[in-house]
A protein has these predicted regions:
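Short, flexible active-site loops
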Residues: 34-39, 98-102
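Short aromatic-glycine motifs in intrinsically disordered, low-complexity regions
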Residues: 17-26, 115, 120-122
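Extracytoplasmic, non-cytosolic globular domains
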Residues: 12, 20-31, 35, 55
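Acidic-and-aromatic substrate-binding clefts and catalytic sites of carbohydrate-active enzymes
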Residues: 5-15, 38-48, 71-77, 139
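Aromatic-lined carbohydrate-recognition surfaces of secreted/lumenal glycan-active proteins
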Residues: 1-13, 65-69, 130-136
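Aromatic-rich peripheral "rim/lid" segments of glycoside hydrolase catalytic domains that contact
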Residues: 48-63, 71-192
Length: 192
């Protein structure tokens, strides 16, 4: 098993796939390739990029795992990327605009992002074996202090009181709807 960051970037995933291709061909016991998912809302088209990554990894006969999933809705200071927790940028109010909660529009964007992301996972379920989150709730998320100490972030699917955010019920409903549709499509027609 191998797990790495920035696996949504085509050049990175291509490099990883090219590294593992001969090892897989030699029969090395590799179960999966993991992709850390510390995402920044609006930064890039993660669904499109990760779809490519899943397919690239599957092309060498391996499954994908998504690890460390979270999504910051806060502004990205100066195009900052990476997850070196020793990095720290000076606090500025403009970089912490949602101290009192996410505005409704931002919450809806957050929800839609996760609906789209999980739809991608479901569309690629034959090649994805796991998706896990980095933290259970917003109160304990590392995003509150990274890369700017003291910010208030909303990066998980559970709020600061461990209550599910609206995205949870929307995801449950999406899965139920797809299960119903699949059952209906697979139901034998008695009129034939």
């Amino acid at each position: 098993y191998y797990n790495d960051f920035s696996m949504n970037k085509r050049s990175k995933v291509d490099g990883v796939v090219n590294f593992f291709r001969p090892l897989v061909a030699k029969g090395l016991p590799i179960d999966a390739i993991g992709m850390q998912g510390h995402m920044i809302y609006g930064d890039t088209d993660y669904v499109k990029e990760y779809t490519y990554s899943i397919k690239a990894i599957a092309s060498i006969g391996l499954k994908s795992q998504f690890t460390e999933l979270d999504l910051t809705m806060l502004p990205n200071p100066f195009g900052f990327s990476g997850a070196n927790v020793s990095d720290n940028i000076s606090y500025k109010d403009a970089m912490d605009p949602y101290k009192d909660g996410l505005p409704k529009e931002k919450q809806e964007q957050f929800d839609q992002f996760w609906l789209d992301f999980f739809q991608m996972l479901m569309d690629n379920k034959e090649n994805v074996i796991r998706a896990t989150f980095w933290c259970l709730n917003d109160a304990n998320s590392w995003r509150n202090d990274f890369p700017i100490k003291g910010r208030t972030d909303y990066a998980t699917l559970f709020d600061r009181q461990c209550k599910p955010k609206p995205a949870i019920q929307k995801l449950i409903d999406m899965v139920k709807d797809q299960e119903k549709k699949a059952l209906k499509e697979n139901k034998p027609n008695k009129n034939k």
